[in-house]
């Protein structure tokens, strides 16, 4: 059994031992601090119309996101009222969580090795979903691809946004970093 004090996530070890050197060689960085690294991963579930009809749906989404992330999720609320959608200011609309450090590496490992292969008709993620500043965004149609979610106990399958923020300056650097972590790009 591993001691919690000595445990290091697999992808963090891979980054320190292999990826840093490969990126430094590929892009010709002169300083160690120039080498891109993962900064944070933000997970978001928006309930939309379901939350308007039943406020318990946002609570359910928050609980599911907490299970997936291994960290308590925040409930997101409507910033302003929109009468046409029957939305009131302060109404719970979904959940979000920001992962950093070891939990971030653990989540990325589970996403790439366990969750993505469980997606129906999966052919890789888009290689063009970068924002121009080295951050990558992807969406999942169903959050039930994560093994933490018991399919029989959920009332609704939610879509999910995942944003991977890196310290890379360009999209090419960020893509090389994520490819080194075995992110399955289709292009």
Curated annotation (Swiss-Prot):
Keywords (A to Z) from UniProt: Ribonucleoprotein, Ribosomal protein, RNA-binding, rRNA-binding, tRNA-binding
* Entry keyword Iron: no
Cite the GO molecular-function annotations of the record.
rRNA binding; structural constituent of ribosome; tRNA binding
Mind naming one GO cellular-component term on file for this protein? ribonucleoprotein complex
Q: Which GO terms describe its biological process?
A: translation
Query: Would the keyword Ligase be found if you checked this record's keyword annotation?
Result: no
Q: Which Gene3D superfamilies match?
A: 3.30.1440.10
The UniProt entry, under InterPro entries, shows:
Ribosomal_uL5, Ribosomal_uL5_bac-type, Ribosomal_uL5_C, Ribosomal_uL5_CS, Ribosomal_uL5_dom_sf, Ribosomal_uL5_N
Q: Which PROSITE patterns match?
A: RIBOSOMAL_L5
Q: Which domain of life is it from?
A: Bacteria
Please state which protein family the record places this protein in. Belongs to the universal ribosomal protein uL5 family.
Whom does it interact with, and what assembly results?
Part of the 50S ribosomal subunit; part of the 5S rRNA/L5/L18/L25 subcomplex. Contacts the 5S rRNA and the P site tRNA. Forms a bridge to the 30S subunit in the 70S ribosome.
Job description of the protein: This is one of the proteins that bind and probably mediate the attachment of the 5S RNA into the large ribosomal subunit, where it forms part of the central protuberance. In the 70S ribosome it contacts protein S13 of the 30S subunit (bridge B1b), connecting the 2 subunits; this bridge is implicated in subunit movement. Contacts the P site tRNA; the 5S rRNA and some of its associated proteins might help stabilize positioning of ribosome-bound tRNAs.
Q: By what name is this protein known? A: Large ribosomal subunit protein uL5
- The species this protein belongs to is Ruegeria sp. (strain TM1040)
Q: What gene makes this protein?
A: rplE
